[in-house]
Amino acid sequence: MEEGGYAFEVNNGRPTASEFGTTARISSPSLTMSSSFREGGGGGGSKGLTRRRSMKPSFDADNEFITLLHGSDPVKVELNRLENDVRDKDRELSESQAEIKALRLSERQREKAVEELTEELGKMSEKLKLTENLLDSKNLEIKKINEEKRASMAAQFAAEATLRRVHAAQKDDDMPPIEAILAPLEAELKLARHEIVKLQDDNRALDRLTKSKEAALLDAERTVQSALAKASMVDDLQNKNQELMKQIEICQEENRILDKLHRQKVAEVEKFTQTVRELEEAVLAGGTAANAVRDYQRKFQEMNEERRILDRELARAKVSASRVATVVANEWKDGSDKVMPVKQWLEERRFLQGEMQQLRDKLAIADRAAKSEAQLKEKFQLRLRVLEESLRGPSSSGNRSTPEGRSMSNGPSRRQSLGGADIIPKLTSNGFFSKRSPSSQFRSLNASTSTILKHAKGTSRSFDGGSRSLDRSKVLTNEPRSKFPLNQSSEGTSGGGSPNSTKQGDSEKAAGTNNDSVPGVLHDLLQKEVITLRKAANDKDQSLRDKDEAIEMLAKKVETLTKAMEVEAKKMRREVAAMEKEVSAMRVDNKGSDSRTRRHSTNSKGASTTAQLLSGRGSGRMGMTRSTQ
């Protein structure tokens, strides 16, 4: 059965084992696309792999670090979570469809029961009509018997009157004998009495029949009233069933709308993944440019160091030349007249002060580097603790089989894995890397990337393990539910009670209401199914909200990446401009220093010949002691 582009297999309202397999077995386009993204990193994963293989091996760690910081691993985890949610919703949809089939079957059975009840009502009405006709006939017979009784009584009274007349006329001799007159009258009386006895027996039998018919009529009235009550209940149930069918149709339409929204969200996620890949490629290009800038900076620093060395040698040569000149000038003077000129003393003092200032600057730079390294060490220790806690958290929460444990294990691990992407912006915002040399920056970055990559691989394994353990727990929790019948499963989901309590409640209902057992149970089932459908709709709304939040997070990541790219591009432009200015200044300074050294070398040739004859060490020590005094 296919619903909204997804394939399902249903066996008596229970999902088969094919639903719990890998994503490749499901025949939905969106889910297969997400599974390919999990395995190979999307449709363009092979191109990205060939491109990365063609690059230098020295940048592999940096590429892994950049892909990790840009949230590729959390995106996979989020897509896996969304796929699991979609599978759960599909299973719930298949279960609801199986329950709808069961409801339709129960409705058919109810309609059959209603038809049987209507047939019984027709039969009972026919019986009522027959009994009424019998009662009418018996009433007519009773009326006839009463009329005959009255006639017999009138005949008896007439006979008695005739007897009286006979007794009164006995005095006449002309009359016949009384016996001759009484004999036929007595015979008629006997016949009349026999008929009266027969009529009384018939009357008693008719009374018995009327009583039995009245009892049958009362029973028929009771059955008719119960049938009417059942018919009213059936009408109410049919109305409720129609309302529930309307609600089911509304829920199905909402489910279709939610499926469409889910497809749209999946398409948006794919677009965001494509943008993330493009940004990763742009960051890689920016990384090559940054490496080139670092090479220029290193060369510039080497040239600055060479310039400083040349300046120091030049100053030393000037000092030595001035000392030689003072020695040559003081050769013909006495010990008391030998004095160092003021210019030489000032130059030596300036030179020594410059060297002292350089040493102080070096000490300050070393102190700052030590402080920054200590702070970085503390930050990385805190990050390691957080990663260890995140590794312990999913391993402990993966053993739980409840969906609450799943949500609690997914939440913090996702945040901590995403938190790894904030390491470089925090370090650069503190300004520690700007004061250190580029070589030390590169080494510290490599060390931090290696440590974070190790812990991130551990977190990704923990993510996969947690999802698999959760899938297994879902299978274990769904298997015992499928063993129970439909009534018990629906009652267990809505009421949350034990199966024993449900069995006792069903037995009590069956014992209490023998006549109303079928419609009452069906009404309860329909109410419970409506409750479960509402819960499923609420769960789907919550999953859509979670997907919207995940999409917003991805959009924020994309915005931060674009901003970081713009900031890095601006920094690169400024650094390149500064490098060009410094290189031009270095070239001008080098030209001036070369001309000065040539002039100084020509002037100091004569002085160097005389300085070789004298003891340069003693004169240098004397000059130093005088300068310190």
UniProtKB/Swiss-Prot annotation:
Residues 257-493 are annotated as: Required for targeting to microtubules. It comes from Arabidopsis thaliana (Mouse-ear cress). Residues 578-596 have a biased composition (Basic and acidic residues). Residues 1-54, 391-421, 458-519, 578-629 are annotated as: Disordered. This is Microtubule-associated protein 70-3. One of its GO terms (biological process) is cytoskeleton organization. The gene is MAP70.3. It is found in: Cytoplasm, Cytoskeleton. Belongs to the MAP70 family. Keywords: Coiled coil, Cytoplasm, Cytoskeleton, Microtubule. One of its GO terms (molecular function) is microtubule binding.
